Design a protein with these regions (language model features):
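A residue-level detector for the "anchor" residue at the start of short, highly conserved motifs
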Residues: 68, 72-85, 95-386
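A short, ordered amphipathic alpha-helix with a cationic face
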Residues: 11-14, 188
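Membrane-interface anchoring determinants
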Residues: 1-8, 22-26, 30, 34-116, ...
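Short alpha-helix boundary/capping elements
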Residues: 13, 17, 32-34, 332
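A general boundary/transition motif marking the beginning of the first structured unit of a protein
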Residues: 13, 26, 52-56, 316, ...
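Positions in alpha-helical segments
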Residues: 7-11, 23, 311, 347
């Protein structure tokens, strides 16, 4: 009985396999269990692949370390840098592996899809709107922005606002193809993903709860503790749930088109409420709230995968192509069409960078499909999957 061996895979990837060995490998990896073994081997033998591609192992290592240092400089959340490092290496593994195969290229009729960037619209209490974007600064009596984040002017930060002061709200809207950071008056940091909108007060009132509302979309919260704010509790509301926070880090995903609102706790403790139902979450747990009921399900999750977007990454683990395309459509501001239901069910696992072009992302996904079962065609800002 013919078996799939490491040496056969190595020969193939190093382009040393003869015609008979290539035919043998193709036959073996057509079997489901061997196909999985083949993928696992290539992912865990990255340095070997680098030597095949570059014929210089030390140079390959240096390239990885340089890439890691670049990511480290970009990353705001120190606690999760190690995950970004690992993900960067995984992405390079994919590139090294998939370039070995000969597949049909993604068809592009017109290149008009651009990578997402820092941009948002600030709606002031009087209805005026301010465009915030990379390379453009803004400042008024209350706020200032460097084009990447919106912060309160230092002179306007105050923990002693009168309890009888009227609460005035602003809105920050991040369009499709964008992301933006918001630093609230109490020191809480919020990172908004594409196609998201948050309602927040200009000032929190002394002795009252600190409340914000995620109207739709996805946001990561790093909440300033109650101890630093005269014991005031922090509350985040969505259309279906309310989250009570003491001081913690968590992610909420609540897009209008989704039937499930997910809340993932990274650090601390939060209480999730949906009608009369409520649960307490511990780190590495996620709540799922059905928008059509009062049920709250709790499960353990891989935190890195759930918050990979804040590190500039896409992380997919046996994710359906339908869900992947939904994620990509928000970041690249595009539309997509499936020619049949079968393509929607295709599963993909991998960690990719959000700074890559849509063509690069689709290339990787396409190359993981056996027998060319997935093909993409780009027409203007529409991706057709067949």
């Amino acid at each position: 009985m013919i078996k799939l061996t490491d040496s056969l895979i190595v020969k193939y990837l190093s382009k040393e396999a003869n015609l008979f060995e290539k035919e043998e490998l193709n036959y073996l990896i057509s079997k489901k269990k061997n196909h999985k073994l083949f993928k696992n081997f290539t992912y865990t033998n990255y340095l070997s692949l680098m030597s095949f591609n570059n014929h210089d192992l030390d140079k390959g290592k240096r390239n990885i370390y340089n890439r890691i240092r670049l990511i480290e400089k970009r990353n705001k959340l120190e606690r999760y840098k190690k995950y970004a490092f690992a993900a960067s290496v995984i992405f390079l593994i994919g590139i090294s592996l998939f370039n070995q195969f000969n597949f049909n290229e993604t068809k592009i009729t017109k290149e008009s899809i651009i990578i997402g960037s820092d941009k948002a619209v600030l709606t002031l209490e009087n209805g005026d709107q301010v465009i915030l974007e990379k390379g453009k600064t803004f400042q008024n009596k209350t706020f200032n922005s460097n084009g990447k984040e919106l912060s309160y002017s230092i002179k306007n930060r105050s923990a002693n606002n009168p309890s009888n002061q009227k609460i005035v709200y602003n809105f920050l809207t991040v369009p499709r193809g964008g992301q933006f950071s918001l630093n609230l008056e109490d020191g809480t940091e919020v990172l908004l993903n594409s196609d998201s909108k948050i309602k927040f007060p200009i000032k929190f009132i002394k002795g009252k709860k600190r409340e914000v509302e995620l109207l739709y979309g996805e946001a990561f919260f790093d909440v300033s503790t109650s101890q630093n704010n005269n014991g005031s509790e922090f509350i985040v509301s969505t259309k279906t749930q309310k989250i009570n926070v003491i001081g913690t880090k968590f992610n909420i995903k609540a897009y209008d088109e989704d039937d499930i609102v997910t809340t993932t706790l990274v650090e601390g403790k939060i209480k999730v409420q949906n009608g009369e139902s409520q649960v307490l979450l511990s780190p590495n747990q996620q709540s799922k709230v059905d928008t059509k009921s009062t049920n709250i399900d709790v499960l353990n999750v891989d935190v890195f995968q759930e918050i990979s977007w804040i590190n500039g990454l896409f992380s997919f683990n046996d994710t359906s192509l339908e869900n992947i395309m939904q994620t990509l459509s928000r970041w690249y501001d595009l539309k997509f069409i499936f020619k049949s239901v079968n393509e929607k069910k295709f599963l993909f696992s991998g960690v990719l960078e959000r700074t890559k072009s849509i063509e690069d992302i689709l290339f990787i996904i396409e190359k993981t499909s056996s027998l060319n079962e997935i093909n993409f065609e780009i027409i203007d800002k529409v991706i057709i999957i067949e």
